[in-house]
C-alpha cells in the first residue's frame, strides 16, 4: 500500500510513533483516564512537528569590537575581493608572475639610478673641493675644522645651512597681505618675547615682510646711552663670556679656546688696488685733522698692533681697496679725535666680551665707544647656530662661522668689533660699507674688480693684459671661495684719522633674527667689566669702567 504521507519524512513519522508508544505506556500506580490518553498524544505531535534549527555557537564578546569604526571599502577593493565565477587559474598565475617581474625590474632600475647618482655626486664634490683648494692655496688644518662630540652634531654639521639661510632670507622678503601683517608680528612677539612698545613704528601693518620687522628700529628713549661709561653694550643680548685674553687664546667655554689670530686674521696685505673718489675735505676739517695729528702724533695702525704675516695661515685674502661709503662729518671727527687724543700710559692687556642676540632682541648693533675703524675683513665660512648649546659643544664655532671683523683703534690702543653670522642670519649689514655682501654664492662686482689673492709670488694683474678673451673671462661672475677673507680699508673716510670715526652709541649695522657680537680690545690693567655671565643687557648699558 503506498504511503500517503508523502510530504512527511519517514524518520519524523517513525520518531512520532515511537514517542506515542512510549507515552501510551502507563507507569505503575498511575490511574487510567481517557482524558490523559487523548491530550498527551496531541501535545507530543504538536511539539515534534516543529523543525528544530541547529544552534549557532555564540562567539566570545570582544570589548573593543564596537569601539573602532571599520574603514569603508571602495568599490575597487570590493570588486577585487569578490571571487569571479569563472576560475581561470592559468591567467591569474600569469598576472602574478608579470606583476612580480615588473616590481623587480623597477627596484633594480631604481637602485641602479640612485647608486649612479650618488657616485656622480661624490665625484663632482671631490673635483669641486680640489678646485677650491687649488684656487685658495689652502692647506687643511686639523685645528680649524668641525669637531663634533656626537653623531647628532656630526649630522648637523653636514646640513646645507647656508642654502637654508638663503631660502629663509627669500621667505622673509615675501610681502605679506596687510590684513595678515599685524597678527603675524604679534604672534612672533608673543613667541620670542618682543616688546612692541619699544618699536619706533607703532603701526605694525607698515612692515611689509618679516625681514623688515626683524630689522626694526626702536625709540631712542628706550635705549639711553651711558655717556660717562668707558664702554657700553653694543647691542641687546645675553652675556656668554668675558675676560682677559691670555697667550693669544679666547675662552669659548671652560676648557675650550680659540685663537685671536684665527678670529681676526693675521696676514699683512699690500696697498689697495684702487680707491673710491670722494669730494675734497673742507679746509677747516683738513686743518683740524692736521693739528690733531701734529699735537697727538697718532701712529696706531692695524699691522703694527696685531702683527704681520704669521706662520700658519688659514684663509686666503682678497684685497677690495677702499670701501668707505661716505665721508665723515667735521663734528663727528672732532668728537672722536678729541677722545682718542687722551692716550693712556698705563700697562695694557687684551680683553674680550661675547654677547648673544636672541631672536626676540633688537637686531641692530651700535658703537660701544669712541673709536676709528680702519680695516674690514669679511671671512667667508659656515653658518652654524650660535645658540649657547652649540657654543658649548662645537669647538672653534666663531672661527668656522661667517663673520665681519671691523678693526681699528681707540684711545687705549687696539679695538675691534666682530659681528658673527649664524643659521638664518646670513646677511650682515654695515651702514658705511657699500660693497659688503655676506652669505652670497657669487662675488659682487667690486670683489671681482678689486680682489686678488695675496701671496709671496708675483701674480698677473688683469689691467696688465689686453687680450679680449682674458677680459671676457675676468668679467664673468666668480663664486665666493670658502675659507677666504675679503679685505677693504676705510682710509678715504678721513685723511687724518685714516678710517671711519665712530662715536659712542652710533648705529653701525645689524643682522637678521639673532646672532653674536664679539668685542676684542686693548685697555689698561685697571679696566674692569661690570658684567656677569648670562646677564641680560640693553644697548647703551655700561659694561666696563676704569678703576
Curated annotation (Swiss-Prot):
Define the transit peptide region by residue numbers.
Answer: 1-27
Q: What does this protein do?
A: Catalyzes the formation of phosphatidylethanolamine (PtdEtn) from phosphatidylserine (PtdSer). Plays a central role in phospholipid metabolism and in the interorganelle trafficking of phosphatidylserine.
Instruction: Name the top EC class.
Output: lyase
Name the InterPro entries on file.
PS_Dcarbxylase, PSD-B, PSD_type1_euk
Concerning its family, UniProt says: Belongs to the phosphatidylserine decarboxylase family. PSD-B subfamily. Eukaryotic type I sub-subfamily.
- Name the Gene Ontology biological process terms: lipid droplet formation; mitochondrial electron transport, ubiquinol to cytochrome c; phosphatidylcholine biosynthetic process; phosphatidylethanolamine biosynthetic process; positive regulation of mitochondrial fusion; positive regulation of protein processing; protein autoprocessing
> Keywords assigned by UniProt?
Decarboxylase, Lipid biosynthesis, Lipid metabolism, Lyase, Membrane, Mitochondrion, Mitochondrion inner membrane, Phospholipid biosynthesis, Phospholipid metabolism, Pyruvate, Transit peptide, Transmembrane, Transmembrane helix, Zymogen
Q: A single GO molecular function, which one?
A: phosphatidylserine decarboxylase activity
Please indicate if the UniProt record lists Lipid biosynthesis as a keyword.
yes
* Protein name, entry field: Phosphatidylserine decarboxylase proenzyme 1, mitochondrial
| One of the Pfam families matching this protein, by short name | PS_Dcarbxylase
Q: Which residues lie on this side of the membrane: Mitochondrial intermembrane?
A: 130-547
How is this protein organized at the quaternary level? Heterodimer of a large membrane-associated beta subunit and a small pyruvoyl-containing alpha subunit.
Reactions that this protein is recorded to catalyse: a 1,2-diacyl-sn-glycero-3-phospho-L-serine + H(+) = a 1,2-diacyl-sn-glycero-3-phosphoethanolamine + CO2
Q: Per its UniProt entry, which superkingdom is the organism in?
A: Eukaryota
Q: Phenotype of the disruptant?
A: Results in an almost complete loss of mitochondrial phosphatidylserine decarboxylase activity.
Query: Which cofactor does this sequence's record say it needs?
Result: pyruvate
Instruction: Write down how the cofactor binds this protein.
Output: Binds 1 pyruvoyl group covalently per subunit.
EC numbers on record: 4.1.1.65
Give yes or no: UniProt keyword Hydrolase: no
Q: Which gene encodes it?
A: PSD1
Give the residue spans that cross the bilayer: 111-129
What does the entry report about post-translational modification of this chain?
Is synthesized initially as an inactive proenzyme. Formation of the active enzyme involves a self-maturation process in which the active site pyruvoyl group is generated from an internal serine residue via an autocatalytic post-translational modification. Two non-identical subunits are generated from the proenzyme in this reaction, and the pyruvate is formed at the N-terminus of the alpha chain, which is derived from the carboxyl end of the proenzyme.
Q: Where is this site: Cleavage (non-hydrolytic)?
A: 514-515
Q: What is the lineage of its organism?
A: Eukaryota, Fungi, Dikarya, Ascomycota, Saccharomycotina
Q: Give the Mitochondrial matrix compartment stretches of this protein.
A: 28-110
Amino acid at each position: 500500500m503506498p504511503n500517503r504521507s508523502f510530504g512527511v519524512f519517514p524518520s519524523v513519522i517513525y520518531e512520532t510513533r515511537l514517542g506515542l508508544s512510549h507515552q501510551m505506556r502507563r507507569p505503575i500506580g498511575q490511574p487510567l483516564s481517557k482524558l490523559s490518553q487523548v491530550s498527551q498524544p496531541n501535545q507530543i505531535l504538536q511539539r515534534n512537528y516543529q523543525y528544530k534549527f541547529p544552534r549557532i555557537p555564540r562567539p566570545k564578546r570582544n570589548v573593543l569590537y564596537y569601539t573602532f569604526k571599520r574603514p569603508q571599502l571602495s568599490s575597487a577593493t570590493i570588486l577585487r575581493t569578490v571571487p569571479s565565477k569563472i576560475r581561470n587559474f592559468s591567467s591569474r598565475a600569469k598576472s602574478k608572475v608579470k606583476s612580480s617581474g615588473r616590481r623587480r625590474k623597477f627596484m633594480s632600475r631604481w637602485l641602479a639610478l640612485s647608486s649612479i647618482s650618488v657616485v656622480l655626486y661624490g665625484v663632482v664634490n671631490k673635483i669641486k673641493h680640489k678646485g677650491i683648494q687649488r684656487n685658495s692655496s689652502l692647506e687643511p688644518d686639523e685645528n680649524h675644522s668641525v669637531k663634533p662630540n656626537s653623531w647628532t652634531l656630526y649630522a648637523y654639521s653636514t646640513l646645507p645651512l647656508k642654502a637654508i639661510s638663503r631660502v629663509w632670507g627669500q621667505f622673509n622678503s615675501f610681502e605679506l597681505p596687510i590684513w595678515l601683517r599685524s597678527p603675524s608680528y604679534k604672534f612672533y612677539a608673543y613667541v620670542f618675547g618682543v616688546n612692541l612698545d619699544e618699536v619706533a613704528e607703532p603701526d605694525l601693518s607698515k612692515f611689509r615682510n618679516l625681514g623688515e620687522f626683524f630689522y626694526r628700529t626702536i625709540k631712542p628713549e628706550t635705549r639711553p646711552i651711558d655717556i660717562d661709561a668707558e664702554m657700553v653694550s653694543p647691542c641687546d643680548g645675553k652675556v656668554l663670556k668675558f675676560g682677559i685674553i691670555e697667550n693669544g687664546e679666547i675662552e669659548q667655554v671652560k676648557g675650550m679656546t680659540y685663537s685671536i689670530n684665527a678670529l681676526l686674521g693675521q696676514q699683512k696685505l699690500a696697498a689697495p688696488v684702487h680707491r673710491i673718489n670722494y669730494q675734497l675735505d673742507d679746509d677747516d676739517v683738513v686743518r683740524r685733522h692736521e693739528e690733531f695729528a701734529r699735537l697727538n702724533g697718532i701712529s696706531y695702525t692695524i699691522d703694527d698692533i696685531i702683527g704681520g704675516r704669521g706662520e700658519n695661515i688659514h684663509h686666503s685674502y682678497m684685497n677690495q681697496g677702499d670701501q668707505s661709503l661716505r665721508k665723515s662729518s667735521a663734528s663727528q671727527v672732532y668728537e672722536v679725535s678729541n677722545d682718542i687724543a687722551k692716550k693712556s700710559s698705563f700697562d695694557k692687556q687684551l680683553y674680550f666680551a661675547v654677547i648673544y642676540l636672541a631672536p626676540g632682541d633688537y637686531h641692530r648693533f651700535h658703537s660701544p665707544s669712541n673709536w676709528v675703524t680702519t680695516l674690514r675683513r669679511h671671512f667667508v665660512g659656515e653658518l652654524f647656530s650660535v645658540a649657547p648649546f652649540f657654543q658649548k659643544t662645537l669647538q672653534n664655532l666663531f672661527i668656522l662661522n661667517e663673520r665681519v671683523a671691523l678693526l681699528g683703534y681707540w684711545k687705549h690702543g687696539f679695538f675691534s668689533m666682530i659681528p658673527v653670522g649664524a643659521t638664518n642670519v646670513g646677511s650682515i649689514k654695515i651702514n658705511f660699507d657699500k660693497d659688503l655682501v655676506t652669505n652670497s654664492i657669487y662675488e659682487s662686482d667690486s670683489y671681482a674688480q678689486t680682489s686678488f689673492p695675496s701671496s709671496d709670488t708675483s701674480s698677473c694683474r688683469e689691467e696688465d693684459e689686453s687680450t679680449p678673451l682674458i677680459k671676457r673671462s675676468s668679467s664673468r661672475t666668480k663664486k665666493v671661495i670658502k675659507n677666504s677673507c675679503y679685505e677693504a680699508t676705510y682710509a678715504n673716510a678721513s685723511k687724518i684719522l685714516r678710517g671711519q670715526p665712530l662715536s659712542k652709541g652710533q648705529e653701525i649695522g645689524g643682522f637678521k633674527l639673532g646672532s653674536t657680537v664679539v668685542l676684542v680690545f686693548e685697555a689698561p690693567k685697571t679696566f674692569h667689566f661690570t658684567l656677569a655671565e648670562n646677564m641680560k643687557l640693553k644697548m647703551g648699558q655700561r659694561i666696563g669702567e676704569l678703576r
